[in-house]
UniProtKB/Swiss-Prot annotation:
PANTHER family: BIOSYNTHETIC PEPTIDOGLYCAN TRANSGLYCOSYLASE, MONOFUNCTIONAL BIOSYNTHETIC PEPTIDOGLYCAN TRANSGLYCOSYLASE. GO terms for cellular component: peptidoglycan-based cell wall; plasma membrane. Peptidoglycan polymerase that catalyzes glycan chain elongation from lipid-linked precursors. Keywords: Cell inner membrane, Cell membrane, Cell shape, Cell wall biogenesis/degradation, Glycosyltransferase, Membrane, Peptidoglycan synthesis, Transferase, Transmembrane, Transmembrane helix. It is an enzyme of class 2 (transferase). GO terms for molecular function: pentosyltransferase activity; peptidoglycan glycosyltransferase activity. Belongs to the glycosyltransferase 51 family. It is found in: Cell inner membrane. The keyword Transport does not apply. The gene is mtgA. It comes from Haemophilus influenzae (strain PittEE). This is Biosynthetic peptidoglycan transglycosylase. Its EC number is 2.4.99.28. NCBIfam families: mono_pep_trsgly (TIGR02070).
Amino acid sequence: MKKTKRIFTALSHLFSPKWWKKNWQRVVLLFFFAVFALLLIFRFVPIPFSAYMVQQKIANLLQGDFRYQIQYDWVSLENISPNIQLAVISSEDQRFPEHLGFDFEAIQRAIRYNEKSNKGIRGASTISQQTAKNLMLWHGQNWLRKGLEVPATMLLELTWSKKRILEVYLNIAEFGNGIFGVEAASRYYFKKSAKNLSQNEAALLVAVLPNPIIYKVNKPSLLVRKKTSLDFETNGKFRY
């Protein structure tokens, strides 16, 4: 009992505002060091899992869903169809080959759109930002997560090539409830490997990326079908 009390006392000190005010610089430096070390390791080896996969698993367990399973199969970029490589860049981040992690033109367009429109908020996250968020952080709209995303993205661009960023993004992106990565998605929805995806199949997978829980590959809504057609048309004009 005394040991438990000591543990709770220590934790209360750790999470107190006074402790954070005194040690926040150390925490930030430790975060940067941990992220940099992680990126150096994963520059060369397959990613076993992402922070977002862990978040989803824990969230489902807390909700009492013990049957929730993660489907995930790592494949190299050479074993991913150029159709979906092209589709995801064309749809999600056309300036991906050029920018250094942040598309400031897209950010300005999103700000102008959000100021004038009441139809919802338009984002401007790049493939690099989404990769950093999915791999190392958590999903949410709080300022802490958004603040950490900036240095994490900068470190990602500093340590990885564009091809590596795209490879990891396609392997850890969510394409359905518990379905992570283009290989698992290809086998689940189309019964084939990711290297054999057609242009239309690639466009359909990319169309659900904004919200793969609401938008369904196997039951595409009118919006998804329209986006698939638009992505398919755009892909034919876009070159990477």
